Amino acid sequence: MTRFRIALHIVPRRGILDPQGKAVSDALHSLGFPGVQDVRVGRFLTIDTTAENAEAARQSARVMCEKLLANPVTEDFEIASVEVS
Protein backbone atom coordinates (compact mmCIF):
# COMPACT_ATOMS: atom_id res chain seq x y z
CA MET A 1 0.00 0.00 0.00
CA THR A 2 1.15 3.50 -0.81
CA ARG A 3 0.44 6.58 1.28
CA PHE A 4 -1.37 9.43 -0.49
CA ARG A 5 -2.32 12.99 0.41
CA ILE A 6 -5.64 14.02 -1.09
CA ALA A 7 -6.73 17.67 -1.38
CA LEU A 8 -10.47 18.37 -1.59
CA HIS A 9 -12.47 21.54 -2.25
CA ILE A 10 -16.11 21.63 -1.14
CA VAL A 11 -18.22 24.68 -2.02
CA PRO A 12 -21.90 25.64 -2.07
CA ARG A 13 -23.58 24.89 -5.40
CA ARG A 14 -24.38 27.78 -7.72
CA GLY A 15 -27.87 29.00 -7.02
CA ILE A 16 -27.67 28.01 -3.34
CA LEU A 17 -27.68 30.96 -0.95
CA ASP A 18 -24.17 31.52 0.47
CA PRO A 19 -24.54 34.15 3.21
CA GLN A 20 -20.89 33.88 4.21
CA GLY A 21 -19.79 34.43 0.61
CA LYS A 22 -22.16 37.41 0.32
CA ALA A 23 -20.72 38.94 3.51
CA VAL A 24 -17.16 38.54 2.21
CA SER A 25 -18.14 40.01 -1.16
CA ASP A 26 -19.78 43.02 0.50
CA ALA A 27 -16.73 43.54 2.73
CA LEU A 28 -14.38 43.41 -0.26
CA HIS A 29 -16.49 46.01 -2.06
CA SER A 30 -16.38 48.28 1.01
CA LEU A 31 -12.58 47.88 1.10
CA GLY A 32 -12.26 49.19 -2.44
CA PHE A 33 -12.45 46.06 -4.60
CA PRO A 34 -15.41 46.89 -6.87
CA GLY A 35 -14.44 44.28 -9.46
CA VAL A 36 -15.31 41.36 -7.19
CA GLN A 37 -18.29 39.67 -8.85
CA ASP A 38 -19.01 36.66 -6.63
CA VAL A 39 -17.51 34.92 -3.61
CA ARG A 40 -18.27 31.33 -2.63
CA VAL A 41 -16.98 30.29 0.79
CA GLY A 42 -16.33 26.60 1.21
CA ARG A 43 -13.96 24.14 2.81
CA PHE A 44 -10.51 22.85 1.90
CA LEU A 45 -9.59 19.45 3.30
CA THR A 46 -6.44 17.35 3.16
CA ILE A 47 -6.70 13.65 3.88
CA ASP A 48 -3.77 11.29 4.32
CA THR A 49 -4.69 7.72 3.43
CA THR A 50 -3.26 4.53 1.99
CA ALA A 51 -4.33 2.85 -1.24
CA GLU A 52 -3.05 0.47 -3.89
CA ASN A 53 -2.56 3.30 -6.41
CA ALA A 54 -3.53 6.91 -7.13
CA GLU A 55 -6.73 5.95 -8.94
CA ALA A 56 -7.89 3.86 -5.95
CA ALA A 57 -7.11 6.80 -3.64
CA ARG A 58 -9.09 9.14 -5.91
CA GLN A 59 -12.04 6.73 -5.97
CA SER A 60 -11.93 6.44 -2.18
CA ALA A 61 -11.95 10.25 -1.86
CA ARG A 62 -14.95 10.47 -4.19
CA VAL A 63 -16.89 7.98 -2.05
CA MET A 64 -15.90 9.86 1.14
CA CYS A 65 -17.31 13.07 -0.33
CA GLU A 66 -20.49 11.41 -1.57
CA LYS A 67 -21.18 9.61 1.72
CA LEU A 68 -20.05 12.14 4.35
CA LEU A 69 -17.93 15.15 3.50
CA ALA A 70 -20.18 16.97 1.01
CA ASN A 71 -23.93 17.46 1.10
CA PRO A 72 -25.01 16.29 -2.39
CA VAL A 73 -28.07 18.57 -2.34
CA THR A 74 -26.30 21.85 -1.54
CA GLU A 75 -22.57 21.37 -2.22
CA ASP A 76 -20.20 20.48 -5.04
CA PHE A 77 -16.81 18.91 -4.46
CA GLU A 78 -13.60 18.71 -6.42
CA ILE A 79 -10.69 16.37 -5.85
CA ALA A 80 -7.95 18.93 -6.39
CA SER A 81 -4.99 16.57 -6.14
CA VAL A 82 -3.87 13.08 -5.18
CA GLU A 83 -0.15 12.91 -4.44
CA VAL A 84 2.17 10.32 -2.97
CA SER A 85 3.10 11.52 0.51
Stretches with model-predicted labels:
Residues 1-85:
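Long, contiguous binding/interaction regions
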